[in-house]
């Protein structure tokens, strides 16, 4: 078994050092961080000075370097999600960011302002819901991956053995990672969604668990991170695992989602739906092959379910994806194109059964992972469904929940929980739990990528589309529009800073946060507001003749509308764009 991370910790603070004391039974270790030299050493409890200010903490997230120097990030509150095979799983709910420096007197005014902004970015990421950890169980690996490991792997610390794709505090833990003797203080933290339920069908009790692991490679927000990078990492890549634990038997079904794996972008420009751009110069096949080579190594066979529209602005993406699969010619990859919106228009969501019937035989071939109560592997999952739409959120989640239910039906029948001929959909109590969990999963993934809850969750929760659901989709769509255009630059910068895609250099002569604005940025909105206001005033305060009033209204109306279209034409100058890391522009 892996060396567990310490669960109970105390933080002792003095002006010169941070002392992190392990309080687990039998533990005598104390991690010492020198606030001046930043040196990390290991000591024993008797070395903690009695004058130190003491407080309990629940984990070390890591350290980060900002303009003012280093900061220590610790978990101060946690909430128990449940237990996975008798291992407690926690959600971190609050953090504290502690400066190594005692004063900021060494900083200039500009540096002070930059440091304040960087701290706001760090706190923004920490405020995002969905950070999970366990001090005794490896949450970053699927059941199947954990079953195929060597004895040496099982002896490693949680940090050493973790799948680095899903360790969101990997950059913050880089200093602790370099010193194996302190690894029990280093807590790998996953970002995504976890829910656990104790369920009963036919008087038989089993645990049902849903885990979504969000990749920290090519992570970001909706419109600024699309497609793949040169290493083949896809934007918004999420591995979702559904686990059943019954009478010592363990079963799991794994699916993935990720952006269409070619080089494309969709930069916000004030339009409701910016036109996606496919690069004309990038080597798509190189990135595409890198992506699927790694996917096949990790997961096996790939069944791609592409849910984008087959007309309009999404059509070129679907055609390019299909052509890339055909050109690659791999027997390990199968491609299914399903125009979700066309097939399900007019709220005909029952037509999703067409897709399920189409892939049923493939799903049976891929199977699922099952290990019996004696620890013997009964079946392996030989591949995954890789689903995507444009955002890999709303349409994708609907399909994933249906595929997962079909797999769960087979698992529960094999384990003897369901009788022969019994349908999972007929188990009202469990069905309610199942649908709500998948809807919550959809909302979590959507908030982390798009900034709002998911669309279409009324179908996931109830099995049908509702008028209230359509209204909520409209509200979330408007909220997404605002965030994607006017706050996502800051969100993207925050993620890049947290993950180490950008490193702060306090000696940098020019502040990266200082971006000069064109005259249009201030002048055009003011002109539009003034013109629109004058138009309203002219309507309310009629002139001597109706022709005079009409002339004034037309003049100011044309001025306001004209200015609006000029702003729309120059939309990219008005959106909140990232400042720290230059994102690809494929225009």
UniProtKB/Swiss-Prot annotation:
Tissue: Detected in brain, lung, liver and kidney, and at lower levels in spleen and skeletal muscle.
Membrane topology qualifier: Multi-pass membrane protein
Superkingdom: Eukaryota
Catalytic activity: a 1,2-diacyl-sn-glycero-3-phospho-(1D-myo-inositol-3-phosphate) + H2O = a 1,2-diacyl-sn-glycero-3-phospho-(1D-myo-inositol) + phosphate; a 1,2-diacyl-sn-glycero-3-phospho-(1D-myo-inositol 4-phosphate) + H2O = a 1,2-diacyl-sn-glycero-3-phospho-(1D-myo-inositol) + phosphate
GO cellular component, as recorded: AMPA glutamate receptor complex; endoplasmic reticulum membrane; endoplasmic reticulum-plasma membrane contact site; glutamatergic synapse; Golgi apparatus; Golgi membrane
Keywords: Acetylation, Endoplasmic reticulum, Golgi apparatus, Hydrolase, Lipid metabolism, Membrane, Transmembrane, Transmembrane helix
Entry annotated with the keyword Transmembrane helix: yes
Chain positions found as N6-acetyllysine: 456
Domain SAC: 122-451
PANTHER family reported in the protein's UniProt record: PHOSPHATIDYLINOSITIDE PHOSPHATASE SAC1 (PTHR45662), PHOSPHATIDYLINOSITOL-3-PHOSPHATASE SAC1 (PTHR45662:SF2)
Subunit structure, as described in the record: Interacts with TMEM39A. Interacts with SEC23A and SEC24A; this interaction is reduced in the absence of TMEM39A. Interacts with PLEKHA3 and VAPA and/or VAPB to form a ternary complex. Interacts with SACM1L; the interaction regulates SACM1L phosphatidylinositol-3-phosphatase activity and translocation to endoplasmic reticulum/trans Golgi network in a malonyl-CoA dependent manner.
Job of this protein: Phosphoinositide phosphatase which catalyzes the hydrolysis of phosphatidylinositol 4-phosphate (PtdIns(4)P), phosphatidylinositol 3-phosphate (PtdIns(3)P) and has low activity towards phosphatidylinositol-3,5-bisphosphate (PtdIns(3,5)P2). Shows a very robust PtdIns(4)P phosphatase activity when it binds PtdIns(4)P in a 'cis' configuration in the cellular environment, with much less activity seen when it binds PtdIns(4)P in 'trans' configuration. PtdIns(4)P phosphatase activity (when it binds PtdIns(4)P in 'trans' configuration) is enhanced in the presence of PLEKHA3.
Protein name, UniProt field: Phosphatidylinositol-3-phosphatase SAC1
Source taxonomy: Eukaryota, Metazoa, Chordata, Craniata, Vertebrata
């Amino acid at each position: 078994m892996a060396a567990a991370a310490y669960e109970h910790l105390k933080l002792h603070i003095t002006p010169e050092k941070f002392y992190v004391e392990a309080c687990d039974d039998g533990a005598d270790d104390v991690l010492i961080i020198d606030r001046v030299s930043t040196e990390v050493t290991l000591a024993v409890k008797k070395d903690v000075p009695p004058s130190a200010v003491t407080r309990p903490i629940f984990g070390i997230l890591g350290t980060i370097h900002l303009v003012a120097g280093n900061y220590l990030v610790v978990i101060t509150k946690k909430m128990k999600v449940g237990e996975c095979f008798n291992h407690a799983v926690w959600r971190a709910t609050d953090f504290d960011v502690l400066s190594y420096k005692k004063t900021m007197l060494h900083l200039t005014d500009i540096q002070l302002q930059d440091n304040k902004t960087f701290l706001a970015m760090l706190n923004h990421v920490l405020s995002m819901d969905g950070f999970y950890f366990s001090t005794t169980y490896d949450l970053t690996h699927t059941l199947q991956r954990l079953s195929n490991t060597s004895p040496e792997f099982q002896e490693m610390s949680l940090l050493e053995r973790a799948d680095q794709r899903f360790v969101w505090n990997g950059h913050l833990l880089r200093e602790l990672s370099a010193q194996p003797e302190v690894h029990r203080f280093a807590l790998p933290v996953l970002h995504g969604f976890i829910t656990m339920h104790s369920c009963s069908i036919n008087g038989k009790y089993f645990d049902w668990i849903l885990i979504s692991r969000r990749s920290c490679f090519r992570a970001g927000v909706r419109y600024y991170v699309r497609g793949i990078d040169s290493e083949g990492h896809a934007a918004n890549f999420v591995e979702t695992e559904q686990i059943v634990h019954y009478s010592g038997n363990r079963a799991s079904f794994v699916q993935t989602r990720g952006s269409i794996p070619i080089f494309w972008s969709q930069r916000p420009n004030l339009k409701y739906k910016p036109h996606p751009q496919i690069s004309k110069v990038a080597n798509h096949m190189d990135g595409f092959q890198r992506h699927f080579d790694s996917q096949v190594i990790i997961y096996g066979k790939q069944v791609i379910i592409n849910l984008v529209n087959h007309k309009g602005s999404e059509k070129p993406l679907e055609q390019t994806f299909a052509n890339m699969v055909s050109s690659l010619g791999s027997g390990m990859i199968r491609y299914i194109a399903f125009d979700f919106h066309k097939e399900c228009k007019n709220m005909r969501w029952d037509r999703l059964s067409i897709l399920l019937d189409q892939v049923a035989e493939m799903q049976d071939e891929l199977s699922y992972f099952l290990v019996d109560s004696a620890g013997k592997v009964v079946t392996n999952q030989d591949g995954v469904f890789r689903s995507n739409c444009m955002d890999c959120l709303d349409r994708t989640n609907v399909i994933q929940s249906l595929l997962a239910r079909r797999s769960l039906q087979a698992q529960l029948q094999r384990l003897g929980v369901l009788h022969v001929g019994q349908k999972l959909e007929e188990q009202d109590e469990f069905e309610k739990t199942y649908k709500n969990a998948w809807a919550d999963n959809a909302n979590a993934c959507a908030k982390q990528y798009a900034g709002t809850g998911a669309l279409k969750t009324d179908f996931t929760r109830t099995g049908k589309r509702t008028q209230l659901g359509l209204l909520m989709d409209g509200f979330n769509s408007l909220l997404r529009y605002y965030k994607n255009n006017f706050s996502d630059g800051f969100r993207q910068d925050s993620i890049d800073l947290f993950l180490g895609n950008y490193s702060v250099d306090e000696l940098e002569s020019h502040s990266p946060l200082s971006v000069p604005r064109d005259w249009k940025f201030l002048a055009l909105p003011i002109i539009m507001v003034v013109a629109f206001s004058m138009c309203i005033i002219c309507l309310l305060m009629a002139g001597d003749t109706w022709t005079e009033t009409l002339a004034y209204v037309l003049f100011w109306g044309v001025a306001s509308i004209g200015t609006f279209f000029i702003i729309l034409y120059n939309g990219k100058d008005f959106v909140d764009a990232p400042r720290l890391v230059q994102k690809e522009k494929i225009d």
